[in-house]
Amino acid sequence: MAKNNHISASGNSTSGDHRLKEEVLTPTTSASTPHRIFSVDDDPKEIQNDIRYLEGLHEGLKFALHANKSKRSVSSQSPIVHSSNNTLHHHEHQQHLPPTLESLSSKSHSVPDLNTATPSSPKRMHSSIRELPHDDNDDEDANDDSRFIIHDSHGHDLLIDEINCQSPSHLENNDQASNASSTESFTLRERQDAINETHPFGIRIWKPALYKKHRSVQRTAAQDIHETQLKTITWEVTCSNVLWFILFGFPIAILFYSAAIVVFLLGGGGLVTNSAKEYSKCLYKLANYFLWPFGKMVYLLQDEQYLQEDKDEGISMQQFYNWVTSYSNRLVFHQSQAKFQQREDHPAPATESSSLMPPANTTATPLNSNHPSYNSIRHEIPHAAAQRRYFGRGKWSWGRVLFYTIFHLVLQPILAVLSLCLWLLVFTIPMSNVLWQIMYHCRRHPLALGFKYVENSSQSHENEITQQQLNKNILLCTFRAAGWHYYKYTVDGTNVIVVNLISIVFFTIFDFYVLKNFLHWKTWFTYESSIFILCLTSTIPLAFYIGQAVASISAQTSMGVGAVINAFFSTIVEIFLYCVALQQKKGLLVEGSMIGSILGAVLLLPGLSMCGGALNRKTQRYNPASAGVSSALLIFSMIVMFVPTVLYEIYGGYSVNCADGANDRDCTFSHPPLKFNRLFTHVIQPMSISCAIVLFCAYIIGLWFTLRTHAKMIWQLPIADPTSTAPEQQEQNSHDAPNWSRSKSTCILLMSTLLYAIIAEILVSCVDAVLEDIPSLNPKFLGLTIFALIPNTTEFLNAISFAIHGNVALSMEIGSAYALQVCLLQIPSLVIYSIFYTWNVKKSMINIRTQMFPLVFPRWDIFGAMTSVFMFTYLYAEGKSNYFKGSMLILLYIIIVVGFYFQGALSE
């Protein structure tokens, strides 16, 4: 562990500086940014080095605070000491150092200053302490004797406020002797990082960013349809372009050729009116463009009457030519002309994004100052448009009527459906955007569209642009029909694949209620087995939207509100699913789902996360004490949950079952089926209710413990120094703006919950057909595997993503948090619901195993759940993660599930 402290305290008029030099065990490879190491080998001297580091920091803090207090008694105002000041009087500062620091200070001159090291030399991580400035006129801070900020190499600041204490015993009894707080309010990104780092009990842990940020795939997607340079086409791109020509380009071209002929003939062949000839020619050009759109640019001829309306359409031809000649065979990120001009006046540093822009001495002179930015694809009419246009502009004519009649009735519906299909295919998003943009421009100004090959347009001599070319704005230009990188494309902060899966939700509902029940269609997608698969697939995006909405609300509200919303909406959908199953006498399905959820959360999910994390790091280490509340509650819930089962096993009695009544040597002992007898009515059922109440109370106590009485460390995390993070904020722009506002998150949460309830009812109604198609499949085994794992796919993806990025502790916390939700919320709710549901039903008509959830499990369920939880907590307590431990968890899950399969065979 590399530690190097730089401690400086303020003097009367000059600054003192002292650096603690220690051995760097893991030097960083960059001189500008320290590198965080997640996977390291065991070091026998690590604890001693940590103790030396903490002792040195403690002595430095004591000296700094003491020196500042004595100084404030003489001077009313303290000068600011900057950590970057290297011209300090070392001998004056050394006179006031304690012995432990003075001995090290004597050697400081012989040690080179690593803060000025070259990039080739390793740079030590260091911290600095400086005093906060005080204002003489500020009476509120008069009682603050001293305040200091600790700087570290990561750009984090930690504000230390000394609290006046009369005796040392008061400091020992006060947990808040030093109050760590932020120098500014938390941004949304820092709130999400704080939740993920502390992972408080009851708060949703979420991997995808809840804040808006610029992604490289967004810029690439914009570049793919707004190219400004000649490209070197690879064979993969050529293959996709040829497929476009065969599957889509040629049929669309035939369609537009036919439309052009119809408009030309109905318009009198240009003899009656010239407008029909113009619109027919426009359709002919569109047909040629769709046949092979690659390498062609679509430009807009500006009209003096519509200059204000068209000023935000595309980019200027002059900017196009300058970028073509300056940056051949390179993707260019198009920004607005105003930003382009601003970069010319104030050149930006050579960052990753700015390096793609033309140099500051570019001779381009922007024509318009408000061209739109292409940093993201927006399928909407620009805000600067004066009005919406659906039938073009200019004077009405017979040709215009013919064109828009055919366009709105035939051409646009076909293009819209094709654009939607290409969007759903994900990899063909470029052509989907091209079709959408073409439809937009055809509705506004079809006669002003022009088409030209890029290679022909780049032959201008020394960027000589004629006045005619100055009146053209480039709208579209693409060289590819598809791209592999589009699986990372996001829409409003959500992955495009998840967005596209929402279409399956609506199709499933339409398929079941309209096509199957109302129209009585008999096709393969109206069979109940097919609908069952569609329902399982539909739960994945709905669970994702519910999880992201809950996480977004939690990050934008208080911790208490976030905990309540997470507890309610994260479980209500699954509780509703299981309640519907109990109403349809599928109690074994519910029982298997409960046990399967626990097994998946404590065995399969951590196992996959450990193996996934081992892909990049052989070993990951974490602090197992951070999950003390979750581990304790997990073991407690397992014990309480199986108390009714233990009572039934001890006092329930047995029945003797003989294979042959005449031969008493071949007999087995088994528990009789649960019935409404005195044991169940007076012992088992009251104990089940008591356990359900105790489990729910444990969840409330856990929330109160972590979010109320012991919550002082949750938000007391260092945040980045505004001066040190300025370049990062300029590059990534705002991290304060959420992807979803609170109102939007609430609407998405309610809508997703409603859709999930509808899908759950359809899913349960199709279970019988699946069991009939697969006779060997037991309802409990179906719930143990399919119902327990498929709806939780989002949790698995989050956990594996955390582990791959070096945070396996969060992955394991996700598993334990979900297992606790099952034990402390879902199981008590099902116990209470089953009692109220059968309250007015005749007892002799109730089958307890299929219509109720009595909290009585078979012995194999107890064995599987208990061994899984103890195996999980044991491995978690070691504080290390590798693929060996992950493999053990996965193998244990497999063998327990196989045992459940044979349990069903034995029960039959």
Curated annotation (Swiss-Prot):
Residues 1-244, 430-494, 552-560, 609-626, 708-746, 805-816, 873-885 are cytoplasmic. The keyword Transport applies. The modification Phosphothreonine is found at T26, T33, T118. GO terms for molecular function: calcium:proton antiporter activity; potassium:proton antiporter activity; sodium:proton antiporter activity. Residues 73-87 have a biased composition (Low complexity). One of its GO terms (biological process) is sodium ion transport. The modification Phosphoserine is found at S32, S110, S121. Keywords: Glycoprotein, Ion transport, Membrane, Phosphoprotein, Sodium, Sodium transport, Transmembrane, Transmembrane helix, Transport, Vacuole. It is a multi-pass membrane protein. Residues 266-408, 516-530, 582-587, 648-686, 768-783, 838-851, 907-908 are vacuolar. Disulfide bonds: none annotated. Its main location: membrane. It is found in: Vacuole membrane. Residues 1-15, 102-121 have a biased composition (Polar residues). Pfam families: Na_Ca_ex, YccF. Residues 1-20, 68-147 are annotated as: Disordered. The keyword Ion transport applies. The chain crosses the membrane at residues 245-265, 409-429, 495-515, 531-551, 561-581, 588-608, 627-647, 687-707, 747-767, 784-804, 817-837, 852-872, 886-906. Glycans are attached at N361. GO terms for cellular component: endomembrane system; endoplasmic reticulum membrane; fungal-type vacuole; fungal-type vacuole membrane; vacuole-mitochondrion membrane contact site. Belongs to the Ca(2+):cation antiporter (CaCA) (TC 2.A.19) family. Has a role in promoting intracellular monovalent cation sequestration via the exchange of monovalent cations and especially Na(+) for hydrogen ions across the vacuolar membrane. Present with 259 molecules/cell in log phase SD medium. This is Low affinity vacuolar monovalent cation/H(+) antiporter. The gene is VNX1.
